[in-house]
Amino acid sequence: TTCYLSCSIGICLSGRAPKADAENVLASAQIALELARKEGPGATRSFSPKMRREAQKLHTLSAELEAALENGQIRPWFQPQICADTGELAGFEALARWEHPESGVILPPLFLRAIETTGMSGRLGEVILYHSLSALKSWDQAGFRVPSVGVNFSSEELRNPKLVEKIKWEVDRFEVPTSRLTIEVLESVVCQHDDDTISRNIRALANHGFGIDLDDFGTGHAAISNLRRFAVNRIKIDRSFITNIDKDSEQQIMTSAILR
């Protein structure tokens, strides 16, 4: 048997560290190493002062995260989904935004790293689901009919054996039909064949009538058989396929093939 090994490498030259002593150089190399690990096996990153500033900001956000979730600073912003054929509202997607009292609106690429660092993905999911269902209920009472709301669920949440029970409890609490809540799952999560809990949860949610959307389609390795296996209702083509679709004939061909 042949085993192939790889490693992630963080590099710091002594002249780039805040101070040229061993402790600072090693700490700076560790920051670069953490970023290399996030890029996957075999990645290499060289330290820069910008990395330290970002690491310090991440540390600050991580310390403030729990209070932000409890105080309602992190809430969903609702992005409309419009039917291209009719121009009518097809639903909303709930996008998490942190309305920080000092830094202003913080977008997911930054604070989701803090979420991962602190292991609070589940708590974030609970907050976004609660506010999304609450909004649906309020819109109904105001006479504003919204077909559905899509909520993103992380791989950590989808591994929770009690996830289906928790979501069902929330929709019953707000008296929202299951068909009006869409579960959005990243393609990379669906590709994790070895995780039976994830596949069981997604199938169970589909059986309860929840919509299943596959997000960022085209960035992973999801086969057509997986789309059937997970009872996917819709795929959301990754933006990399359509960014220059008006100029790139190959993108037009690939996107057309996916849609058909």
Predicted regions located by residue number:
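Catalytic core regions of nucleotide second-messenger enzymes
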Residues: 1-7, 37, 104, 140-147, ...
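Active-site core of bacterial EAL-family cyclic-dinucleotide phosphodiesterase domains
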Residues: 13, 57-115, 147, 152, ...
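Signal-transducing alpha-helical linker
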Residues: 21, 53-60, 64, 70-73, ...
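C-terminal EAL-domain catalytic cores of bacterial cyclic di-GMP phosphodiesterases
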Residues: 124, 130, 174-183, 194-215, ...
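Catalytic core of bacterial c-di-GMP phosphodiesterases, primarily the EAL and HD-GYP domains
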Residues: 13, 17, 44, 84, ...
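Structural preference for long, well-ordered alpha-helical segments in enzyme cores
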Residues: 25-33, 61, 94, 114-115, ...
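Cyclic nucleotide signaling catalytic output domains
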Residues: 8-17, 24-39, 45-60, 64, ...
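Catalytic strand-loop-helix junctions within cyclic-nucleotide turnover domains
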Residues: 2, 7-25, 50-53, 81-86, ...
